Amino acid sequence: MDYRNTLNLPETDFPMRGNLPQREPEILQKWEEEDIYATVQKARAGRPKFVLHDGPPYANGDIHLGHALNKVIKDIIVKYKTMAGFDAPYVPGWDTHGLPIEQQVIKKLGVNRHAVSVVEFRRMCKEYAKKYISIQKEQFKRLGVRGDWKNPYLTLEKEYEAAQIGVFGKMARKKYIYKGLKPVYWCPSCETALAEAEIEYAEKTSHAIYVKFPVKEGKGVLTDENTFVIIWTTTPWTLPANLAITLHEEFSYVQVQVEKEHWLVAEGMLESLRSLWNLELPVEKRFVGKELEGVICKHPFIERDSVLILGEHVTLEAGTGCVHTAPGHGEEDFNVGKKYGLPVLCPVDHQGKFTAEGGAYAGMKVDKANPVIIEDLKNLHALVHEDKIKHSYAHCWRCNNPIIYRATEQWFASIDGFRKAALEEIDKVQWIPSWGKDRIYNMIADRGDWCISRQRTWGVPIPIFYCEDCGKEIISDETIAKVQEIFREEGSDAWFLRPAAELLPEGFTCACGGKSFRKETDIMDVWFDSGTSHTSVLMERKELAWPADLYMEGSDQHRGWFNSSLSTSVAAYGKAPYKAVLTHGFLVDEKGRKMSKSLGNGVDPLQVTKEMGADILRLWVCAADYKNDVAVSPRIMKQMSEAYRKIRNTLRFLLSNLNDFDPAKDRVAYKDLPEIDRWALLQLGKVTQRVLQGYEKYEFHWVYHSVHNFCAVELSAIYLDIVKDRLYVEGKNSTLRRASQTVLYDVLNALVRLMAPVLTYTADEIWPYVPGVPAGSHVQTEEMPEALPQWLDEALEKKWDTLLAVRSEVTKALEKARQDKLINHPLTAQVDLYPNAELEGFLRGIPNLSEIFIVSAVQLHSAGEEKPEGLSMAEDLAGFGIAVNSAAGEKCERCWIYDTGVGENQEHPTLCPRCASVVSHL
């Protein structure tokens, strides 16, 4: 008789191989056909809301790994919250305006933006943005991200733009919006102002020069003849705009002798200057900074005075302690100049070229003027020293060219108007990680006014008019309401298509009586676009809520979207738009280096999805401690693939042993389960608690490690290893087998749900195979499992901790015996145990030790019994010896256990008594 046919061998149609690149698109198609998003939302209607508000990615190019990390984290959160019983809508969005899209249109379509109409250029930009929205949308969906993809929010939509105008109007009504002449970050290449969030820092080599400014009027403090104040600058091109030299009122300054001249520098810099200039610089006089206020110098090459003033921003970190001050080219210079009533001189135009005010340098680009100015200083004997330095310098975020500080008339949002309220709101928000609070707090506390105007065309226009008669700026509740109404119907293109008269209320007149108006030509900063999504999206869409429960983006958004959203929300409504803010780090390779094309260390998420599957990528996101920088490489992805295989194989093994199990009628009550089964449920309870805690605290790596370790250790290496015999060999409907199947079912059912937010495709694939699952049901509409209190038996845990420590020592002894060729398989062995007195008492209370150790027999000797020679002594259990011997009896043909009872049953002479009994009852 072939006894193999009498075994309960595992069987399932659930595939062993994931084959994810082929299978996932089929599942995705099914989701789309069934409208999984609507199905889930319907299932959670009326439940408490949880709103994660999507920070909009830029509609430009294919998605990269940073996008994948961001969107998958959001998807894990939303899917978990849904399964935790919340109504958790997710409305994805896109940021669609701004310079990067303009640049791509110019570059890829070969368009000269000055040669086509504004309306036509904007149409091209819109088409470009929409193209990449469609591309990115499909790419995000392929990652398994569930959302309202049919109705995303786009910053170019007319409803969005109208709501944005409304926020601007609220800020203007509170006098937070003003026009001012002050230095702003300016990109000469892109010909526009930039916000702080549009600046990136990179290393740059600059000229560093020390220049003599001759004293013209010493005011009785300095002598007028042959006395010079020495300044230091790394931007020689700003010297034509110099109007003052700033000292610190409390610093000590010294007059030193250099041949027949007298030079003024800060005493704190003297030693470093002696070394750098290789001069002795003997001290002639000392002054305190405030004594020198009002001394007048002559500009070294322009007929103009340069006055000595005082400022707190002067430091002794570099230079001379005498700071070259050009109010038109620096924020600190501007602020100190304002205090002294200095004019704002900016002899540089929008292309970074000197204007006529630049004198001899007119028409020259500022970077080209540097060496010319230095040469002129040499010829005038005004150059003390010239050097080159490498330093971190501000560059444009899009064209990557160095930027300049340039005073221009711009529109600003006055941060001072609502700074205090914003700082108070920061205290009310939960910041994860907690250091994010200090970061954004300091940024808001130190932030200057926000330059919100841009000299471009692809964006939302600043809704301000000018009276042609008196030049007054026109903005009121009435004009804002009219523009908002038109934009809601026609979008912001109306600003460029209609004359001013049609955009203003009918019959509108200026206070001066004027009836002719022109429109502002600047558009809003894109950070104002995305920063008003709290109104345009959260307030406007009925399925969402304001404030959002969570904003989640990269940590660079403390100065970007988190900042602009907080600023506009507090300015308009006096409250933060979010209850909590979660940030993730940046991507690095295994050596901690940032991803870059030059290093060739990037990982393409689309390629990973194509070759391995989206669930592998999602598992990597889950495994990462994403709050810090996240390491990624092909090797790490391979590790994730292996971890996935372990989890999948474990789930498949569970399924394959449940092919005849009906949870409605085959379950065994908890009280009737053997200890090993109750121990497995204890472990399931613990892993369930840990996983749910990980989701709640956004510590998803807890989820990954808990599930992976549970599959690899508690299940595969212990429980499943032990009960395999029972599952295969015991009678099909025996209580012992059904007890194990009850546990397998509970473990499978829980694990699939616990991992569903992460392994979204695999959970969906396996769910219909789970016994008792209604046809057509979705795992995504299920709720998370819970750890039943009865499972969490502390006494049982303590007992099994000891028993598993013994098992571990036995396993080591068996492995040694196998290596020594004493046995070829654990089932050929009998284990003789020589415990200490305490352990003996413990082990005598454990039935079926052979089942737990997976050997044919166990002989437990008394503690007082003499231990034989050659005994293996346990490493971690004092006084515990183990001997491995060949098991007595014959090998059972059916279960492979050696038993002295093999042959007793004449009908089945090759079987042990247990197997003979089972077979006889078939």
UniProtKB/Swiss-Prot annotation:
GO terms for molecular function: aminoacyl-tRNA deacylase activity; ATP binding; isoleucine-tRNA ligase activity; tRNA binding; zinc ion binding. It is found in: Cytoplasm. Its main location: cytoplasm. It holds the Pfam family Anticodon_1. SUPFAM superfamilies: Anticodon-binding domain of a subclass of class I aminoacyl-tRNA synthetases (SSF47323), Nucleotidylyl transferase (SSF52374), ValRS/IleRS/LeuRS editing domain (SSF50677). It is an enzyme of class 6 (ligase). Binds 1 zinc ion per subunit. A motif ('HIGH' region) lies at residues 57-67. CDD domains: Anticodon_Ia_Ile_BEm, IleRS_core. Transmembrane segments: none annotated. It comes from the Bacteria. ATP binds at K597. Its EC number is 6.1.1.5. Zn(2+) binds at C892, C895, C912, C915. Its cofactor is Zn(2+). The keyword Metal-binding applies. GO terms for cellular component: cytosol. A motif ('KMSKS' region) lies at residues 594-598. Monomer. HAMAP family: Ile_tRNA_synth_type1 (MF_02002). Catalyzes the attachment of isoleucine to tRNA(Ile). As IleRS can inadvertently accommodate and process structurally similar amino acids such as valine, to avoid such errors it has two additional distinct tRNA(Ile)-dependent editing activities. One activity is designated as 'pretransfer' editing and involves the hydrolysis of activated Val-AMP. The other activity is designated 'posttransfer' editing and involves deacylation of mischarged Val-tRNA(Ile). IleRS has two distinct active sites: one for aminoacylation and one for editing. The misactivated valine is translocated from the active site to the editing site, which sterically excludes the correctly activated isoleucine. The single editing site contains two valyl binding pockets, one specific for each substrate (Val-AMP or Val-tRNA(Ile)). This is Isoleucine--tRNA ligase. The lineage of its organism: Bacteria, Bacillati, Bacillota, Clostridia, Eubacteriales.
